[in-house]
Structures are given as C-alpha cells and as structure tokens.
C-alpha cells in the first residue's frame, strides 16, 4: 500500500534532516475568530486601505480523543479538569501563525464533569474546544461518522462549547436555521465560507424531525450550498468532507469522482468551490490540483491515541498526518477568483510518549535526527502527499 518514493521526496527529506539550523515559519499575529453565530470577526484579514491582501489558511485532520488522550489531558491539568492545550502546543506556532485555521472535530462533547468515553461511541470533555481556540483555530467542521454518537444532545453540547469560546463551526446544527448557514470567516479583506459534510453516521439514523442535524454528502446539495454561500457574500468557499476508506493511503473512487464533480462546478465564470479538505481515513492521503481547485483527499489524524487497524494490528500511520497551508492571493479584478499563490504541507506526528504530544515533524526530526521512526514517518507522509502529481502543480513541503 505504500507508494513508491519519487526522487523529489527523497531529496526533500534528506535536505530537511540535514538542515538543523532551519526554524519554523515566523508566526503572524493571531486572528480573532468565531462568534456564537459561527462568523469570525475581522482582524488580520481586514482589508487594508489599498484593498484586499493575500492571506494564509491552514487545515488539520481529525481531533479524535480516545480514552488515553482524555487521561493525558487530565494528567496535564494536574488532575483538576482537562488540559488538551499541552498536547497541541508543538504545532501552535503553525496554527496561530495563519490568518485562518480550520480543524476537524471528529467527536461530540459530554456534559461538563462527564462521564466521558472514547471508542466506539465518543463523548469528549468540552475543554477540547477551549484548547482548540487557544492554539489558534478559527473554525472547526463537525460533520463526521461520530456526530450522532450521543444524539442531538451531543451536538448541542458540542456547539454550545464552541460558541462559549468563540470558535466558529459548521457541519452539524441545533436547529434548521443554523443548518442553513455556513461558517463565514474573514481574512485578507475576503469573506470565506466553510461548509462541511460526512459520508454517514455509523448507521445511526438522523434524529426524528431533525434531518438537518448533520450534513450528509450529496453532490448537488454541496454545489447548491456553495452557490448560496456566494449569494450570502462569500468570496471563497472551502468544503470540508469526511470521506474515503479507513487505513487506505490512496483516495478511493468516490473521493476521486466527487472531487472532479465539485471542482467542475461553476456558476457563470466563477468556480463554485475554492478548496476541498478531506478527513476520515486516519492516514495521510494525497493532495491534488483538480480543475484548478486544490483538493486534500485526507489530512490524517491530528490528535489520537494508539491506532489499530481492523485486524487488530497497531498502525503508526494513524498518528501521522499533514497540515495543509495555502496562501490565497487577491483577484486581479473585483468579482474574479482568489487564487492559491503558494501551496504547502507540513508533516505532523502524534508522539505517543508518554506523554502524548502533537509535533511538527520537521522540527522533531531536526531535533532528534537519529530517530528512525521520525525519519520513516517524514518519508511516508511526503511520499503519499505528493503521490498524485501535486509537486508538479506547485505543492512543496514548508521549509
């Protein structure tokens, strides 16, 4: 299943491991984000007197607090509550350094004080939301196969917790009105709409009378929602999709077909969708420029415990992922498309410790060049990410 490593990947990995003096990208001032109405406040993204400016968007994969992750958060809080921020501190410069930062919140939250559960029916501490906000996330999508693990109450608690800390959200809803609104975010003088959908909910039916509780994948609906977001004032539309085959490095046929169809969507001369961000497979998958729209088939897991395949074997790929970073440049004329002027990825790993810590894999490999597991993860992530020709389209590993 492991892709053949192209020469470009080998060169990039070798250069990275040799460049111990290179540091992480310089952080920009933090963006002010999400209000209880899921609309981020203008901050760095406010237009300058000379007009719109370029902005950066980062996106990460599944936040999946298994029981051992919950226990680590309790230990990090000294036994009093839950602190998920220490586990994410290693990637905070990357997240907070972007104008917009998007996460995928895989699970729903339990009531304050618990009880909390991991796999198979997740119920996470609501303190996760504060940690995500403090790390620098602007918005999280909440459409996944675990969205209905605790029914409508789980959705309500999750979105209430996000509202309380000012974290925007999209993909699940407490009422029909909320379901009809995308997350509208601001950066570079642009309004960015985020939409989110999942392939299913683990066989749990949508709650009676609540067909809008979680967005399910439907090509025509996604395109219609994207056009509605444009009508609501969005300059760019980002679609987060929970799809794919778990433990498969390569995108499946549904992913490839849907990506082509969504990227081909057009209303007049404007593309309907500007960026597609995939989650669910638990492993990193390829990036590809599809009909001028960058598509990330699978980001992998941002935060998870020990990961096991269906046959019971522990698989380290479940703790490897990529951070997508795209720089969008203003259109040459009003009404035209914002374009990606720089496309980058950052390899990431959850080091299982103890303690559990999410790390920028570039920095971790520079600090500990003798770690064979870091070198192996770096090589694999790079190989998979570039396996569908993204390097030729301009994608690079961030220096």
Residue ranges and their predicted role:
Residues 1-11:
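Bacterial N-terminal signal peptides that target proteins for export
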Residues 2-3, 23-399:
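Acidic, metal/ion-coordinating pockets
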Residues 18-21:
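C-terminal motif of bacterial Sec signal peptides marking the signal peptidase cleavage site
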């Amino acid at each position: 299943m492991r892709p053949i490593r192209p020469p470009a990947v080998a060169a990039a990995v070798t250069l990275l491991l040799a460049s111990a003096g290179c540091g992480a990208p310089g952080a920009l001032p933090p963006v002010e984000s999400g209000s209880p109405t899921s609309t981020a406040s203008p901050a760095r993204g406010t237009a300058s007197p000379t007009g719109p400016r370029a902005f950066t968007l980062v996106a990460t994969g599944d936040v999946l607090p298994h029981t051992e992750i919950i226990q680590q958060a309790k230990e990090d809080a000294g036994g009093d509550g839950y602190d998920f921020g220490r586990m994410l501190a290693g990637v905070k410069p990357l997240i907070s350094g972007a104008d917009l930062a998007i996460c995928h919140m895989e699970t729903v939250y339990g009531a304050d004080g618990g009880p909390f559960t991991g796999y198979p029916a997740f119920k996470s501490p609501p303190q996760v939301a504060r940690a995500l906000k403090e790390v620098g996330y602007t918005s999280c999508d909440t459409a996944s196969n675990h969205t209905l693990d605790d029914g409508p109450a789980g959705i309500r608690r999750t979105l209430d917790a996000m509202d309380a800390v000012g974290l925007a959200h999209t993909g699940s809803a407490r009422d029909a009105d909320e379901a009809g609104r995308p997350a509208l975010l601001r950066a570079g003088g642009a309004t960015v709409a985020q939409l989110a959908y999942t392939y299913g909910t683990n066989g749990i039916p949508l709650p009676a009378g609540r067909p809008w509780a979680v967005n399910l994948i439907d090509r025509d609906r996604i395109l219609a929602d994207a056009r509605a977001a444009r009508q609501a004032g969005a300059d760019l539309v980002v679609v987060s999709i929970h799809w794919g085959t778990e433990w498969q490095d390569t995108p499946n046929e549904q992913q490839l077909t849907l990506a082509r169809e969504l990227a081909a969507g057009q209303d007049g001369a404007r593309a309907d969708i500007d960026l597609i961000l995939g989650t669910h497979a638990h492993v990193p998958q390829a990036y590809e420029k599809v009909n001028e729209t960058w598509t990330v088939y699978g980001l992998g897991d941002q935060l998870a415990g020990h990961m096991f395949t269906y046959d019971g074997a522990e698989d380290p790929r479940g703790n490897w992922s990529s951070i997508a970073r795209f720089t969008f440049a203003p259109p040459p004329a009003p009404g035209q498309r914002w374009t990606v002027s720089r496309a980058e990825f950052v390899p990431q790993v959850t080091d299982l410790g103890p303690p559990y810590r999410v790390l920028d894999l570039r920095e971790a490999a520079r600090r500990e060049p003798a770690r064979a597991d870091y070198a192996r993860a770096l090589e694999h992530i790079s190989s998979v990410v570039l396996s569908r020709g993204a390097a030729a389209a301009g994608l690079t590993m961030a220096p």
